[in-house]
């Protein structure tokens, strides 16, 4: 039996809604879970496309739930790396998103583009 079954990133952001809409609108992800806070705005949500799942949680709700993690929540220390079948389609889908690194060929044999999603996290798309 495998020790690990799945790895799902939880992106800690100021606002959940823009992040989930990025994946839903541009890539056809489905919203699988939503948790509103007292003001009705989402404090947590997850999206999924086939076997790929991404979770978002607000920085404020993490700090409320785990006050000791306040110092760990500044900045962004994760980049998502997504292997894709068609980089041309991805480039069209991310049009208008802030580009971190334009489309380029890498020394390890892939062609990639890196953008920022609305929460400020870097997402790289690679075609091997």
Language-model-detected regions and their locations in the chain:
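Short, glycine-anchored, charge-dense loop/turn motifs used at functional sites
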Residues: 117-123
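Conserved active-site tyrosine of GNAT-family acetyltransferases
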Residues: 19-24, 94, 120
């Amino acid at each position: 039996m495998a020790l690990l079954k799945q790895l799902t990133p939880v992106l800690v952001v100021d606002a959940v809604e823009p992040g989930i809409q990025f994946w839903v609108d541009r890539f056809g992800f489905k919203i699988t879970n939503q948790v509103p806070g007292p003001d009705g705005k989402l404090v947590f949500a997850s999206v999924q496309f086939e076997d790929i799942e991404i979770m978002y949680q607000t920085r404020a709700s993490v700090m409320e739930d785990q006050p000791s993690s306040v110092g760990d929540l500044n900045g962004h220390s994760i980049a998502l790396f997504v292997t894709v079948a068609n980089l041309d389609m991805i480039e069209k889908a991310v049009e208008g998103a802030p580009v971190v690194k334009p489309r380029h060929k890498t020394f390890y044999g892939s062609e990639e583009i890196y953008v920022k999603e609305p929460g400020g996290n870097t997402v790289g798309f690679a075609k091997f």
